[in-house]
């Protein structure tokens, strides 16, 4: 077994006291902007946790494609594992981990589909090859071979060799509207800082609690 004790290093100094924040979205935006400058890969990557009909959890990395005070948005195939699980149980948890900053943000909330207009607008911004891939992929289904996938991609590419690629009807997005947002920052000797914002429903006022690490 690898001894990870020596991998621990001193937390970089940061300015300000994030525990003084009185609402979560502005704090999240500040942390995300700092992560964009610091993280080498995908600062908008987040772990998305859902639950299947048997109560067995699923988790996977996805990319957040937008956020505001209404919630956190991501896109995928509606018939994928995550899409089916969210249709059956529209609740989810998210985790952002920014290793370079020694920070993480945990989010729990209710999930609703984005509008067709939102999905269309985002899909139009994707590179054409990614748009073609969305048509060719039957996400979460069994795939015979990589060659079969490449054939499907080539077939779609030939169909849309000229002009715009429309959004597939089975591809859309979801918005996670949070009722819990927790901010955690590493400190020396595991004496970390941790605060949680909570509310019972969207639109209500947030309450803040400082938590033991």
Swiss-Prot record:
Cofactor(s) this protein cannot do without: FMN
Positions contributing to substrate binding: 65, 122, 126, 190-192
Positions contributing to FMN binding: 60-65, 75-76, 82, 104, 139-140, 184, 194
Superkingdom: Bacteria
Disulfide bridges in this chain: none
Role: Catalyzes the oxidation of either pyridoxine 5'-phosphate (PNP) or pyridoxamine 5'-phosphate (PMP) into pyridoxal 5'-phosphate (PLP).
Family named by the database record: Belongs to the pyridoxamine 5'-phosphate oxidase family.
UniProt protein name: Pyridoxine/pyridoxamine 5'-phosphate oxidase
Organism: Bradyrhizobium diazoefficiens (strain JCM 10833 / BCRC 13528 / IAM 13628 / NBRC 14792 / USDA 110)
